[in-house]
Amino acid sequence: MRLITLFLLLLLLAIQYPLWLGKGGWLRVWDMQKQVTAQNQRNAELKQRNTKLEGEVKDLKEGTGAIEERARYELGMVKDDEGFVQFVAPAPKTSETPLPPPPPAGQQAHH
């Protein structure tokens, strides 16, 4: 009886191996599902990027507004009857108190 039980237990383990660890087993299916989810997310990001790029291409092909905007912001170009004005942030205020003079040459600070 013990021999039959041991044999059936080994047979059960042999049957379980492909289910969990074999080709097409649960672990591989779970891993593939994670990969598919990651790829779907990447595809959605790329679709959104492509849609944005298609809109830019359409604007560049159909009108001069997009070209003018790029020339102004990316290349700093202006029209003939315009003047270029650039606003610069004010420099940070410096301290009004002067720094102490450096020690005379030849003397070292003792700690």
From Swiss-Prot:
Residues 89-111 are annotated as: Disordered. Residues 31-64 form a coiled coil. Residues 1-3 are cytoplasmic. The chain crosses the membrane at residues 4-21. The keyword Zinc does not apply. Pfam families: DivIC. The keyword Cytoplasm does not apply. It is found in: Cell inner membrane. It is a single-pass type II membrane protein. Its main location: membrane. Residues 22-111 are periplasmic. Keywords: Cell cycle, Cell division, Cell inner membrane, Cell membrane, Coiled coil, Membrane, Transmembrane, Transmembrane helix. GO terms for biological process: FtsZ-dependent cytokinesis. GO terms for cellular component: cell division site; cell septum; plasma membrane. InterPro entries: Cell_div_FtsB, FtsL/DivIC. It comes from the Bacteria. Part of a complex composed of FtsB, FtsL and FtsQ. Belongs to the FtsB family. Essential cell division protein. May link together the upstream cell division proteins, which are predominantly cytoplasmic, with the downstream cell division proteins, which are predominantly periplasmic. This is Cell division protein FtsB. It comes from Ralstonia pickettii (strain 12J). The lineage of its organism: Bacteria, Pseudomonadati, Pseudomonadota, Betaproteobacteria, Burkholderiales.
